[in-house]
Amino acid sequence: MGKSDFLTPKAIANRIKSKGLQKLRWYCQMCQKQCRDENGFKCHCMSESHQRQLLLASENPQQFMDYFSEEFRNDFLELLRRRFGTKRVHNNIVYNEYISHREHIHMNATQWETLTDFTKWLGREGLCKVDETPKGWYIQYIDRDPETIRRQLELEKKKKQDLDDEEKTAKFIEEQVRRGLEGKEQEVPTFTELSRENDEEKVTFNLSKGACSSSGATSSKSSTLGPSALKTIGSSASVKRKESSQSSTQSKEKKKKKSALDEIMEIEEEKKRTARTDYWLQPEIIVKIITKKLGEKYHKKKAIVKEVIDKYTAVVKMIDSGDKLKLDQTHLETVIPAPGKRILVLNGGYRGNEGTLESINEKTFSATIVIETGPLKGRRVEGIQYEDISKLA
């Protein structure tokens, strides 16, 4: 019987079968060969190459088992790290995704008999956090990458520095309040009883009709009054001058206190303006891929950030092809639009505010923007670095 042609249904079916997963009982782990049926597997077991592999394995079976176990563990953990990160996930979900690859290492060739035994072993070795629930075993990858540990240390250091700055500001405010209380004497009002020398005397009120009449009456009275009355008037005038001088000094003290408060507010605003973080990814911004590890297809191509994971990783969608990729922020850079386009501030005191690009300065690699959202709407900000802003999708 002749061999079937390339486009016959049988040939097409054979090629489809060869690409997909076959039954596990017809797979030879030593030779890493998958047979399609029982007859093919029987022929393979009788072949010379298979017999040679069995002889090699019989000389040192533990070495082969350790090799397969190590490969299985490394591939499983790599899939868990790349696909799920540090999220808590059911172990069966990870295993099903792992065995979907045609060239995977089968568990029956390793030192673990079941997936539960392998999960418990991961927990004992400290590679993952494992816990048992009524729905089964859940695992969580423990990231011990030096870069991740360095980021965590930097975040802890920054939090500690922020707490120190807050304590310094609180002490400064307390010192200002203490100085203000020491320089100001507290005035306690005193209440006295109304005393009348003659109970039969009537109480009268003199209401002047206007400034002219009062000034005229004063001038006429001053002409007829004696020197003692003039002394009394002079003393009352001096008392008024003293009161006015005291009120002016109090107003000056208030101005000084207000200036100190303004100084504190300026310090806080400057601190917020200069506050920076080592992460900048935000959803719905346009970024450019700068890594060459993905090939020329994605190098220097633009994409839209769809999701941010753990502050440093983003799921991006390519603008031209629509492909979705999961990349670290070190493999991305911001995109500066043309003047007049909308942007998003990614770092500094204006983080999270949308704005409009007004102009760019190519010599200093900075830009001038106008804030469009938030309480600072309408403010014009100069000297914003290129890496602190990006074009909105």
From Swiss-Prot:
Recorded superkingdom: Eukaryota
Positions in coiled-coil regions: 147-180, 250-277
Region (C-terminal subdomain A): 284-334
Tissue occurrence: Ubiquitously expressed in all tissues examined, with highest levels in skeletal muscle, heart and testis. Differentially expressed in non-tumorigenic and tumorigenic cell lines. Highly expressed in proliferating epithelial keratinocyte cells in vitro (at protein level).
Location of region: C-terminal subdomain B: 340-391
Extent of Low complexity compositional bias: 209-224
Localization: Nucleus; Cytoplasm
Renumbered residue ranges of the record's region Disordered: 209-260
Primary site of residence: nucleus
Residues carrying N6-methyllysine: 135
Induction entry: By UVC irradiation in quiescent primary fibroblasts. By mitomycin C in human melanoma MeWO cells.
Molecular function terms from GO: DNA binding; double-stranded DNA binding; RNA binding; zinc ion binding
UniProt cross-references to Pfam families, sorted A to Z: C2H2-zf_KIN17, KN17_SH3, SH3_KIN17_C, WH_KIN17
Stored InterPro entries: C2H2-Znf_KIN17, DNA/RNA-bd_Kin17_WH-like_dom, KIN17-like, KIN17_WH-like_sf, KN17_SH3, KOW_KIN17, Rib_uL2_dom2, Znf_C2H2_sf
Zinc finger (C2H2-type): 28-50
Keyword field: Coiled coil, Cytoplasm, DNA damage, DNA recombination, DNA repair, DNA replication, DNA-binding, Host-virus interaction, Metal-binding, Methylation, mRNA processing, Nucleus, RNA-binding, Stress response, Zinc, Zinc-finger
Region feature (Winged helix-turn-helix (wHTH)): 51-160
GO annotations of cellular component type: cytosol; nuclear matrix; nucleoplasm; nucleus; protein-containing complex
Modified residues annotated as N6,N6,N6-trimethyllysine in this record: 135
Note: Recognized by antibodies directed against the RecA protein.
Family per record: Belongs to the KIN17 family.
Domain remarks in the Swiss-Prot or TrEMBL record: The C-terminal domain (268-393) is organized into 2 subdomains that bear structural similarities to SH3-like domains. Both subdomains adopt a similar 5-stranded beta-barrel-like fold and are connected to each other by a short linker of 5 residues. The 5 beta-sheets are packed at approximately right angles against each other. A highly conserved groove formed at the interface between the 2 subdomains, comprised of Lys residues 302 and 391 and other positively charged residues, may possibly be the site of RNA-binding.
Subunit structure: Associated with DNA polymerase alpha, RFC1 and cyclin A, in multiprotein DNA replication complexes. Also associates with replication origins at the G1/S phase boundary and throughout the S phase in vivo.
Protein name: DNA/RNA-binding protein KIN17
Organism lineage: Eukaryota, Metazoa, Chordata, Craniata, Vertebrata
